[in-house]
């Protein structure tokens, strides 16, 4: 294999921040060929009604062909296992009805993916466009990340504080887009192994890499 193409299907556009994490996991699991990630931007497609998760997965594979499909759902207020089972049912439905056999991995952060972006202060400063900033930032400890009720708002507040902007300049600060950039400034995601949801994802990726002989 000269390259490995993966497609990420997410709840929303800001969740494409997961891509550097997924690429890092693949590398850590032994993938040495070129990795070509793409985010499935289904919002560009004209689709009637509200497609089911299985239908969205089918569209992702059809319009963004890949060797591996990552399917993201935030657990939010649901137990992580509920979301995981939901994705697995959709995978089974897709394979029965559409004969799509692309390998798939469930990506289910507890609460929401922003919880996985709250451990690297320097990355937050870089993403905020103020890498030399001196405004104190209070990051939660890694052990409590999965218990934070609204990690997105915590991340957004950190980015606003890190920017050290105020007034109209702060009003024009696109915090959601800045949040997407955080992972691009992180080289090592190993601290997240302390989180059960992340550890489970790494185990699933490792197992699939071995099954597919990608290492």
Report the location of each language-model feature.
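C-terminal accessory helical subdomains adjacent to catalytic cores in phosphodiester-
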Residues: 1-5, 15-43, 48-68, 72-215
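Short hydrophobic beta-strand that contains or immediately precedes a catalytic carboxylate
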Residues: 8-10
